[in-house]
Curated annotation (Swiss-Prot):
Subunit structure, as described in the record: Interacts (via OCIA domain) with OCIAD1/ASRIJ and STAT3.
Region (Disordered): 1-23
Organism listed in the record: Bos taurus (Bovine)
Residue ranges of domain OCIA in the record: 1-120
UniProt-recorded name of the protein: OCIA domain-containing protein 2
Pfam families cross-referenced by the UniProt entry: OCIA
Lineage: Eukaryota, Metazoa, Chordata, Craniata, Vertebrata
InterPro entries hit by this protein: OCAD1/2 (IPR040187), OCIA_dom (IPR009764)
Residues where N6-acetyllysine is found: 41
Protein role: Has an essential role in the assembly of mitochondrial respiratory chain complex III. Is also required for STAT3 activation and plays a role in cell migration.
Signal sequence range: none
One GO BP: response to bacterium
GO cellular component: endosome
Subcellular location: Endosome; Mitochondrion; Mitochondrion inner membrane
Keywords of the record: Acetylation, Endosome, Membrane, Mitochondrion, Mitochondrion inner membrane
Length: 154
C-alpha cells in the first residue's frame, strides 16, 4: 500500500518542497532546468581538446628537444639512468604547460555558454528572482510587481 502512494508521487514530477518551505524567490521551472549535461559536455570537450591539441604536442616536442640536447652534449646525461630523467621531466613540464595554455580557450567556451543561459542558473542574476514566466510566479509576484509599478500619490 505504501508503494502505491510513492508511485503516485513519482508521477506528479520531481520532488518540490512544500509551499510553506519555499522562499519568496522560488521558481519551479528555473530550479528544474539545470544544464548539467551541457556543462559536462563542455568539460569533456575541453579535456580532450587540451590533451590532443596542446598537452600531447608540447610534451612530445619538449621530450624530443631535450633528447636532442642530451645527444649533442648540451645537457649531460645521468651516468646511471642516461637521458631518461631529463626527458621524463621535459615531458611532464610540456604536458603541464600544454594543459595550462588551453585554459583561455575553455574559459571562452564557458563564457559563450553562459551568455546563452543568462539568468537560467548562471551569472550574477542567478537565484535573485524568477526569470522564467511560470504560472506560479505570475500569481505570487504579480501583485507585488503591480504595486511597485504604480507611482505613489504623495
Amino acid at each position: 500500500m505504501a508503494s502505491v502512494s510513492t508511485h503516485e508521487n513519482q508521477e506528479k514530477g520531481p520532488h518540490l518542497p512544500p509551499p510553506s518551505k519555499q522562499s519568496l524567490l522560488f521558481c519551479p521551472k528555473s530550479k528544474l532546468h539545470i544544464h548539467r549535461s551541457e556543462i559536462s559536455k563542455i568539460i569533456r570537450e575541453c579535456q580532450e581538446e587540451s590533451f590532443w591539441k596542446r598537452a600531447l604536442p608540447f610534451s612530445l616536442v619538449s621530450m624530443l628537444v631535450t633528447q636532442g640536447l642530451v645527444h649533442h652534449g648540451y645537457l649531460a646525461a645521468n651516468p646511471r639512468f642516461g637521458s631518461l630523467p631529463k626527458v621524463a621531466l621535459a615531458g611532464i613540464l610540456g604536458f603541464g604547460l600544454g594543459k595550462a595554455s588551453y585554459i583561455g580557450v575553455c574559459q571562452s567556451k564557458f563564457h559563450s555558454f553562459e551568455g546563452q543561459l543568462r539568468g537560467a542558473g548562471f551569472g550574477p542574476g542567478h537565484n535573485r528572482h524568477c526569470l522564467l514566466t511560470c504560472e506560479e510566479c505570475k500569481t505570487k509576484h504579480g501583485l507585488s510587481q503591480e504595486r511597485s509599478s504604480q507611482p505613489s500619490a504623495s
